[in-house]
Regions:
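Non-catalytic connector elements of ABC transporters
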Residues: 245, 252-365
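ABC ATPase NBD coupling module
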Residues: 70-85, 115-116, 229-233
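Helix-to-loop junction immediately C-terminal to a conserved catalytic motif
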Residues: 53
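ABC-type ATPase nucleotide-binding domains, specifically the catalytic core motifs of the NBD
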Residues: 73-74, 97, 104-117, 128-129
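ABC ATPase nucleotide-binding domains
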Residues: 78, 103-105, 120-122, 127-237
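Conserved ABC transporter NBD signature motif
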Residues: 61-72
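The feature captures the beta-strand-to-loop junction immediately N-terminal to the Walker
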Residues: 38-40
């Protein structure tokens, strides 16, 4: 475990009966970073968080939190828990206690803090989450967003080194969820606590993180910065899961440096960047982000093909086109609505171009 890490998972395995939930998971979380663990339901992300806080016990491998290896030693586990805040999707507020009393419960009972000091800290946290005027109200008198702010304040009040957040915004509506994403991000930036944030929402992951760990099938598929993850996915699952993606199935028929030629299942040929499929004869799924393809490109691109517009959908800042291209009837283009004078309508044939460097030859699906 490096000196700048607060969490280290090494070859961690976890089973529920015969179901192998975590499979040789390796993950290092740096001090004061904001890392998002993102993946579909059942991928193992929440189980990993529960193992870190010892709500579940792993069977194999090593988990170290703040220099302490988590084993069956209850003394060690309790000392770690005193430094870890938790926020869940369910707010878990005590309905018979006021907001301030909910927040002071942990410092008074866990850290044996004097009541007056705990109440002062509670008010400081309520200022941070911008609801100090709600201190004497009860949870039932608050909106969902206000209750979640109380849950966040409660997790921070005893100055933890680490906060674990397991889908904390899942119960909120879209607008409130987006607002709270920025609030949590700004709180982290202002106080510098380490945050491990679990979500299945790809947009939330891109918004909230310094780094993203994409989980699937009990494994970390890729751990990267948001831009690296989006622009340079290492396999087909990551490319599909993070952001929108156009795909073609095919076989590599030639390779020269950072360019390969792929014969698609439709019989057409395109040029791509050999990332996973690097040898002649390898099957591949080719990945291309919608915004990387252009209509009637003004510059030379090494892929140029004709497609037919099947559907036009207005999205405010851009128009979304569904195109029949090279055997893919679900090929998506995004055209900025500042592109004036472009004749876009269903049934029209268009020229579409993109560069091979933006088109990644990944593992076959």
């Amino acid at each position: 475990m490096s000196e700048d890490s607060i969490i280290s998972l090494q070859n961690v395995n976890k089973w529920f009966g015969d179901f192998h939930v975590l499979k040789d998971v390796d993950l290092q979380v740096k001090k004061k970073e904001r890392i998002v663990v993102c993946g579909p339901s059942g991928s193992g992300k929440s189980t990993m968080i529960r193992c870190i806080n010892r709500l579940e016990e792993h069977q194999e491998g090593t988990i170290i939190v703040d220099g302490i290896e988590l084993t069956g030693n209850l003394k060690n586990i309790d000392s770690v828990r005193k430094e870890v805040g938790m926020v869940f999707q369910q707010f878990n507020l005590f309905p018979h206690l006021s907001v301030k009393e909910n927040i002071t419960l942990a410092p008074i009972w866990v850290k044996k803090m004097p009541k007056a000091e705990a109440e002062e800290l509670a008010m400081q946290q309520l200022e941070i989450v911008k609801i100090p005027e709600q201190a004497d109200k009860y949870p039932g008198q608050l909106s969902g967003g206000q209750q979640q702010r109380v849950a966040v304040a409660r997790s921070l009040v005893f100055d933890p080194k680490l906060v674990l957040m397991d889908e904390p915004l899942g119960a909120l509506d879209k607008n409130l969820r987006e607002s709270m994403q920025y609030e949590i991000k700004h709180i982290h930036e202002s106080i510098g606590v380490t945050v491990v944030y679990v979500t299945h929402d790809q947009t939330e992951a891109l918004t909230m993180s310094n780094r993203i760990a994409v989980f699937n099938d009990g494994k970390v598929q890729q751990l990267s910065s948001p831009d690296e993850l989006y622009e340079r996915p290492v396999n087909s699952f990551v490319a599909e899961f993070i952001g929108e993606n156009n795909t073609f199935g095919g076989e590599v028929i030639d390779v020269a440096g950072d360019k390969c030629k792929v014969k698609l299942n439709s019989g057409a040929e395109i040029f791509a960047n050999p990332i996973v499929a690097k040898a002649k004869g390898e099957k591949t799924t080719v990945s291309l982000r919608p915004e990387r393809a252009l209509i009637d490109p003004q510059t030379t691109m090494d892929n140029n093909h004709k497609g037919k517009i099947e559907e036009v959908i207005y999205h405010g800042d851009h128009t979304r086109l569904r195109v029949d291209l090279l055997g893919n009837k679900q090929f998506i283009l995004k055209v900025p609505n500042s592109s004036s004078g472009m004749d876009i309508k269903a049934g029209k044939e268009i020229n579409i171009g993109w560069n091979s460097i933006d088109c990644r030859a990944l593992d076959p699906k």
